């Protein structure tokens, strides 16, 4: 669990920075995904904005709750982790169905899909252990 804070900070601040960069068109052309300038792809990309910001809000809020010793930080963390998995899965599904493979975007979204699974497992395991006590 001690590494979860680092993963949350990297992911949540990363999402905020990504959306600020996207909003102000600061992402270099060479880093952009394929067809990033087509209206459909712009809409597809921005469809993730509410989800990604909700991930950041719930993740950062769970860290705050943990810092002030509120037990419900675990529930907020679990919500954030599940939403993060969904974000990565949705993006990878789209890239798969459109037969598009860009290593950088696949790595970012693979990270979003996979890293939360370890912490979801730990939170659920800890919850079961607490319930049995």
UniProtKB/Swiss-Prot annotation:
**Any Pfam family the entry gives:** DUF5360
A single Gene Ontology CC annotation of this entry is: plasma membrane
Q: Where are the transmembrane segments?
A: 5-27, 42-64, 77-99, 103-125
- Could you list this entry's UniProt keywords, alphabetically sorted: Cell membrane, Membrane, Transmembrane, Transmembrane helix
Tell whether Membrane is among the UniProt keywords. yes
Membrane topology term reads: Multi-pass membrane protein
Which cellular compartments is it found in? Cell membrane
Name of the protein described by the UniProt record: Uncharacterized protein YvaD
